[in-house]
Amino acid sequence: VSIDSFDVLVSTHQAYIDAGADVITVNSYASSRLVLDPAGLSSEVRSINMKNIDAARLARERCGDDAVLIAGSISHALSFASEQEKSTATCIEAFDEMVSFFEEGEVDLILLEMMSIPTRMLPLFRSVSSSTLPVWCGLSAQRAAPTALITGYHDETIPLIDNIQDA
């Protein structure tokens, strides 16, 4: 979106601010190298993410409300085209890169979205813990049955609390 429809992205952020949002989220949930490389966009990872940040910053500037915070979004999602799990080292490299974009773009905080897969959560937690930016973490969980343990989305055998305690 940031490449082809930058103005639409800015307008969307502005609409959220006009509606009273205290925090706007950079359109970066699915723009890490883990998602963009398989889509053939490896040479554009930096450009896409910096434009995403610029769109949020421009919207805040146009609205004239410096109290609105900008959250840089990171997920541990892989490309839908990806058929195999990525190595921990590959994940850390991609997550560190996203953190560096957010620091360079001067976002106000990092938002971890839909955390549910322990093998990718831990490397992401490691990457964001090296940043001076505050971190907001959203967990994704489910129950297989009404009386079952709350578990991570992808592994019903591991209680969610165990994932959090490991992190």
Question: Which residue stretches match the model-derived regions?
Answer:
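Domain-level signal for soluble alpha/beta catalytic cores
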Residues: 1-167
